Amino acid sequence: MSSTSSSQMVQLVADKHVRYILMAEKKKESFESVVMDHLRMNGAYWGLTTLDLLDKLGCVSEEEVISWLMTCQHESGGFAGNTGHDPHILYTLSAVQILALFDKINILDIGKVSSYVAKLQNEDGSFSGDMWGEIDTRFSYIAICCLSILKCLDKINVEKAVKYIVSCKNLDGGFGCTPGAESHAGQIFCCVGALAITGSLHHVDKDSLGWWLCERQLKAGGLNGRPEKLADVCYSWWVLSSLIMIDRVHWIDKAKLVKFILDCQDLDNGGISDRPEDAVDIFHTYFGVAGLSLLEYPGVKVIDPAYALPVDVVNRIIFTK
């Protein structure tokens, strides 16, 4: 399905990945589509951002995407994973990111959306994901990233938010989902990303964290999320983006990681899997292409490691009043 037996590195089959993403949206009755129905907003963000990184966002109907996206907004201001589902901070960020891709943030009632996010901050500075109250540093990142894109960071207590994130730092330099929780690459991205956006990276022990992150690279070149786990393409994003934000990306073997990602492609039908020869999906296709972007692979647009959006999109947001 994916890798070749020769030592020669395969190339990125970008056109096939574009076709795979466009076809995936049309296969409403497929197993993948059915099981992902409740998080379609995330799937849309993964697919659309991949298309943008490959300079093919124009292949989709902007009007159709935005029309569907707005049906997912709840009266609270938050967005759900699909029409008729409950709102959650995770899907709200994905919705805002999608609108950013299309330069359509102005269609939002920004005050309403930002208030929904801000109300999820707890007294200790942490954030809940929704009204049910689960707390996780993922939600801290999501809130900070979302409000930064909307230019509404002043709606939360940033100092308390940063203090809570720092309280989740471990002796190995990494970060967990809550204070005392095990360090994990996904949580590290969230914490480092939030600290980067708020200008608080001085709280990170860059050498200790950099060492922990570069130890995630295995012999085949791929990265895992924590010790003793298998390599997975998605960590090409979580680990690499964090290393870039703390200026330690030169500590890993980039060429071997590029080969690992490329070997996870389905060269016939498009899409990228978690590891060579496994089934492809939208999630890993996005993180594989995003990882190649961070690795400066030819033909892939540059992605911002903190905002997880193409740099041209982020620049447009930052420099627009």
Curated annotation (Swiss-Prot):
Cofactor note: Binds 1 zinc ion per subunit.
Modified residues (N-acetylserine): S2
Swiss-Prot/TrEMBL PFTB repeat ranges: 14-55, 62-103, 110-151, 158-199, 206-247, 254-296
Reactions this protein catalyses: geranylgeranyl diphosphate + L-cysteinyl-[protein] = S-geranylgeranyl-L-cysteinyl-[protein] + diphosphate
Keywords, ordered alphabetically: Acetylation, Magnesium, Metal-binding, Prenyltransferase, Repeat, Transferase, Zinc
Similarity field: Belongs to the protein prenyltransferase subunit beta family.
Function (record text): Catalyzes the transfer of a geranylgeranyl moiety from geranylgeranyl diphosphate to both cysteines of Rab proteins with the C-terminal sequence -CCXX, CXXX, -XCCX and -XCXC, such as RABA1A, RABA2A, RABF2A and RABG2. Involved in the geranylgeranylation of RABA2A. In vitro, can prenylate PGGTI targets with the C-terminal sequence Cys-aliphatic-aliphatic-X (CaaX) with leucine in the terminal position. Substrates with the C-terminal sequence -CSIL such as ARAC11/ROP1 or GG2/AGG2 are prenylated independently of REP and when the beta subunit is associated with the alpha subunit RGTA1. Required for male fertility and root tip growth.
Protein's recorded name: Geranylgeranyl transferase type-2 subunit beta 1
